Amino acid sequence: MSEVQLVRNCAPTLAGLKTGNLFACPYENREDLLDFLRSLNRRLGKKGVRAVPLRIRQDRGLIYLYRPARLEKDLSCASCEALLSEFGYNCRGGSRCLTRLARRLKQQEDFPHEIGLFLSYPPEDVKGFLEHKPCKCVGCWKVYENEEAAKKTFAKYKACTRVYCRQLASGIDIERLTVAG
């Protein structure tokens, strides 16, 4: 995994604009992937960012880069707790819920629909998706409620990714790109 791939997939989380990003990471050697994640956690942990493999298959890891403190806050809202309880999450706290999510990812081939709650999707949009409502627009996720706010968020994420990729290419390292928080 390269830092370029990390920035392309996770710039909004590195910038502190969202809780987490999820991306598939091809690898040739499982131990090399885990070593890279350990190194990344040493470098970014002091900024409040962690990377964990949620699922590792033959040649691809599913990596979740996130801000634990923000995940804790996101998942503690009443609407998130209600949605998560529908899927058997009886956990309080981000790390316990993350463990449950990883277990669900390993047990099923498809993505668990509640995964959006771990990626800063609004709970009302996750619920709209689960209820098969007609969506208002599609960007980083399917939007079922506040279309204008979502479009602004999509534009912020896109601009952030563009700026971060440019800064990385100019030689700014990932630690300097990562906002503390």
Segments and roles (model prediction):
Residues 1-57:
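A structured, charge-rich N-terminal accessory region that forms the first stable segment of a protein
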Residues 18-20, 59-61, 112-114:
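Short, surface-exposed beta-edge/turn micro-motifs
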Residues 36-93:
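A glycine-rich, hydrophobic loop/mini-helix early in the fold
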Residues 58-59, 98-101, 130-145:
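Short linear loop/turn motifs
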Residues 90-95, 123, 138-139:
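Short, surface-exposed acidic
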Residues 93-109:
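Helix-hairpin-helix/helix-loop-helix acidic hairpins
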Residues 111-137:
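Hydrophobic/aromatic-rich, well-ordered segments within soluble, folded domains that form packed cores
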Residues 139-181:
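Long, compositionally biased
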